Every structure is written in structure tokens, then in C-alpha cells.
Regions:
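Conserved class I S-adenosyl-L-methionine
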Residues: 113-124
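A short acidic, Gly/Pro-enriched loop at the edge of an enzyme's catalytic core
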Residues: 113-114, 176-188
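Polybasic, low-complexity RNA-engagement segments
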Residues: 1-42, 54-59, 296, 303-456
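Mobile active-site "lid"/loop adjacent to the S-adenosyl-L-methionine
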Residues: 150, 185-227, 243-251, 269-272
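Class I S-adenosyl-L-methionine
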Residues: 184, 237-240, 245-349
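Conserved SAM-binding loop of SAM-dependent methyltransferases across substrates and taxa
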Residues: 125-138
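S-adenosyl-L-methionine
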Residues: 145-182
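Helix-to-beta-strand junctions that scaffold the AdoMet/dcAdoMet cofactor pocket
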Residues: 137, 232-234
Length: 456
């Protein structure tokens, strides 16, 4: 493998770097596949029978735990995730193993059982946000942000699939969060970087790497962090990470945070056998030392500013009236939820966070919030796909069980035969987990799986 000019020389003095071992890891042909399970949608067994290796059988696929993530697993081979209905049901997320170290940063720096206000600043496509949503309590709130508009919709879809109701998806520049001064308990910034940590996984990334690009990324990372730090309260935690090996984007950013912004490093306890290297104020993942790709993470505590947000909100959605609540009641478990109306669309928000959700609508460009329950047409609810994916649906909603071939046809929006009993809206369910909606008519049923999500 031919690394970019100047790349290996730049790493020579970096903690844990071994030129020969690093090069060997990149020429080994090893491909690491890992997933993280969704605690909101537990599976009786993993891997499920629907997860198959191309040309193989289920028994060929074995798993082993990722030591720094309780719900993370390595897979012996990369199966066909696209044709596993349980992937589309949101029971697991395909994620790079090293980045799951976020779990240790959260567990060791904050009390995750307490009500927390968390911001995932650079969140698309959603790996860290779905992980954060699994880690924080039901009494917490997560703002999942992506500055690029098109990517914010991908983020929204993954948040919906994961099934929680305490997440707001936003599409804002980091500087916009200064409007929420001292609001967040935790800010996670997985900053855009030069991407050298992914060279083994994505060799084409080498063509874009240059020492000049590293400097540009470092400047951008400083701008992003300087813009968002006002939103972190005094005593709050900043978790900074990149998928770059370059010191300019890693240790030097840590030094800048301490020297220029008074941020205090938070040391994490990392067992030696994990193979993670402590470097400066952060932690490095080398592909010759860990089973994963290149990654860097550091934790800091803010020691200046106020401990509480003092702003007010102006924008308010209408609370659902008695007639609307009656139309929605058969569909959703409303305990602890507040139903709100935006034009003809009903949303369910956590009761505890209604005032805060209104604050986000007022201060941010909100793409999605809570659970989109459905649209009211002539006082009847047309259920939304997000409701099918959520974990707050009423227990007695009608459903039709699909076999594997039917489930795949459903996800492809192809025609298939299905014996149905009662008419009307029903969940299309595979292995007891919802995939979406069908509407059963006298002589047929209509498939309401979203066109933009269908598998090809």
C-alpha cells in the first residue's frame, strides 16, 4: 500500500506508532465488521437467522464482544445487512468498533442515570447519536445535529428507526448553538477531519489526504469547537473525537482547548489489554493494536461560565385538544407524553421536555422531534412510519406477521401475497418487530413503506 507523501513521516514521533506494524495492518486485507445492538428493541438471539453471509449459511457467522461497548459485537464476516429485515426494524446499527469507545467516555465522565441535556454536534449518519440515545436515561434529551441539509435527513431516518422519543434532529451550524448559552450538560463533537484513520477501510481517502488539508481541518476543528463551547454549561463535559492520526487534529487540538479555553482534561480508566494508547490528553486507536480502525478521543470539563441557561422561548405548537387525543389514543401509549399539533400533523413529545422542545423550535432549525404520530384527515389518524418504528406505540395495534421472503418484498415495495383477517391499518411485522404499515382493503392491501427507504 502506497501511503501519501509525508504521511508516515508525520506519525514517527506519535505515541504508539510502529511503522512496520502500521503498514502491515494496512496490507493484511483484514476487514473488521462490527454492530451495536439496540436495547430498545432487544433480540432473543444474535445473529438472527435472517442475517446471512452471501453464499453461506447462518452457522458460518460468529460474533465476539467489543470490550469497551456492552452492546457491541464483532462479526466474523460481513453479511448482507441490506436483506435482513431486522436491520430495517432498527434492532442494530452497523458501526465501526473503535468509535464505540464513546460509551466509556460517557460512563466515566458523567452520571448517565441522571437527566442530561446532550448535544451531538456533527451527528450524521447517526452512529454516535443512536449510541448516545441508548446510553442516556429516558429522562434525558438528545439534540442530534448535522450542518449539511441532505445528511440531516439521513440522520433523521436513522433516529426514527432507532425508536426513541427523546431526540430532536437539527440542521444548524455550530455557531447557532450560542443561542443556547450554558444549556448542555454534554457536547459530543466528532469533528470533520482529514480521514486518515479510515485508510484501510477506504483506500480512496488517501487521494484526498495532504499536509495542507490536515492544517485546514485543524483550523476548521478549532472554529467548530470555539463556536459550540458557549452552549456547554460550567461543569459540563466535552467529548472530542476524530478519525484522523494527525497530531494537528488530535493532541494539538487538546492542547489548544486547555490553553485557550481553560478546558480541564478528564482522564479515563482504560485496561491495558484493550490496546488503546493514552497520548497527551486523549486516547489513540491504532489498527495494529486494536480490532478496529484509526480513532482518537479526548474528554474535557468546562470550568468557566454559568451552570444554567437563562433564555426564554417564544415559538409554541398547539396542544392537541380532546377530539385529537381521542383520535390518537388507540395508536400510542400517551403516559408521559404530550401531544402537539403542527398544521395537521400530530407529534408526541416527552412531557418533561415540552418547554425545551419549544425552545429548540425557537432557536434552531429543527428537522424532526419526538415521535411523528401521523396526520389527521377528517378527524381520523393516518399513522406515520415513525410511529411504527417507535417504542411508544399502543400494545393492541393490529399487525400482520410476515415471513422472510414477504418481509423483503415489503421492504422492496414489490407485490406479494398475504393472508389478512381484519381490514384497516396494520403493522407489517417480522419476527415480532414492526417494519412499517399496510392498509388492508376488501380485495387487497396497500404497502405504506416509505418510497425513499425501499431497498433495491
Amino acid at each position: 500500500m502506497n501511503f501519501p507523501p509525508g504521511f508516515l513521516e508525520q506519525l514517527t514521533s506519535t505515541a504508539g506508532f510502529s511503522k512496520d506494524a502500521f503498514a502491515a495492518a494496512h496490507t493484511s486485507g483484514l476487514s473488521v465488521t462490527s454492530v451495536r445492538l439496540n436495547p430498545l428493541k432487544p433480540l432473543p438471539v444474535f445473529p438472527p437467522s435472517s442475517l446471512k453471509i452471501s453464499g453461506g449459511i447462518l452457522s458460518d457467522l460468529t460474533i465476539s464482544p467489543i470490550p469497551w461497548c456492552d452492546t457491541g459485537y464483532y462479526l466474523s464476516e460481513r453479511p448482507s445487512f441490506t436483506f435482513d429485515p431486522l436491520f430495517h426494524a432498527g434492532t442494530y446499527y452497523v458501526q465501526e468498533a473503535s468509535s464505540m469507545f464513546l460509551e466509556q467516555a460517557m460512563k466515566q465522565s458523567v452520571d448517565i442515570s441522571a437527566p442530561l441535556k446532550v448535544l451531538d454536534l456533527c451527528a450524521a449518519p447517526g452512529g454516535k447519536s443512536t449510541h448516545l440515545q441508548s446510553l442516556i436515561s429516558k429522562e434525558s434529551v438528545l439534540v442530534s445535529n448535522e450542518v449539511i441539509r441532505a445528511r440531516s435527513f439521513i440522520l433523521r431516518d436513522n433516529i426514527i428507526k432507532w425508536g426513541g422519543d427523546n431526540v430532536v434532529v437539527a440542521n444548524n451550524d455550530p455557531k447557532d448553538f450560542a443561542r443556547l448559552e450554558h444549556y448542555f450538560d454534554v457536547v459530543v463533537a466528532d469533528a470533520p477531519c482529514s480521514g486518515s484513520g479510515l485508510f484501510r477501510k477506504e483506500p480512496e481517502a488517501m487521494e484526498e489526504w495532504s499536509e495542507n488539508n490536515v492544517q485546514l481541518c485543524s483550523q476548521r476543528q478549532q472554529r467548530i469547537l470555539a463556536d459550540v463551547l458557549p452552549a456547554l454549561k460550567n461543569g459540563g463535559i466535552l467529548i472530542y473525537s476524530t478519525c484522523s492520526y494527525s497530531k494537528e487534529e488530535d493532541e494539538e487540538i487538546c492542547h489548544w482547548l486547555s490553553a485557550e479555553h481553560g478546558m480541564q482534561p478528564v482522564q479515563l480508566s482504560v485496561p491495558m489489554e484493550w490496546g488503546i494508547i493514552e497520548s497527551g490528553d486523549g486516547y489513540r486507536f491504532w489498527p495494529d493494536r486494536v480490532k478496529g480502525e484509526g480513532f482518537f478521543l479526548a474528554c474535557f470539563q468546562k470550568t468557566v461560565g454559568q451552570e444554567k441557561y437563562h433564555g426564554k422561548t417564544a415559538k409554541q405548537l398547539s396542544h392537541a385538544g380532546q377530539q385529537i387525543r381521542a383520535a390518537v389514543k388507540p395508536w400510542i401509549a400517551t403516559e408521559g407524553k404530550q401531544l402537539l399539533l403542527h398544521e395537521s400533523t400530530v407529534y408526541a413529545w416527552p412531557e418533561k421536555w415540552v418547554e425545551d422542545f419549544h425552545l429548540f423550535l425557537d432557536k434552531l432549525r429543527v428537522v424532526y422531534s419526538g415521535v411523528r404520530v401521523g396526520e389527521l384527515i377528517r378527524e381520523k389518524l393516518i399513522p406515520d412510519h415513525a410511529l411504527a418504528m417507535s417504542t411508544c406505540m399502543a400494545n393492541d395495534v393490529l399487525s400482520s406477521a410476515l415471513q422472510l421472503d414477504q418481509a423483503i418484498a415489503y421492504l422492496q415495495k414489490k407485490e406479494f401475497s398475504l393472508e389478512t383477517g381484519q381490514k384497516g391499518w396494520q403493522l407489517a411485522v417480522y419476527d415480532q418487530l414492526p417494519l412499517g404499515w399496510i392498509n388492508v382493503l376488501p380485495n387487497r392491501f396497500n404497502n405504506y413503506y416509505p418510497k425513499e427507504l425501499r431497498i433495491l
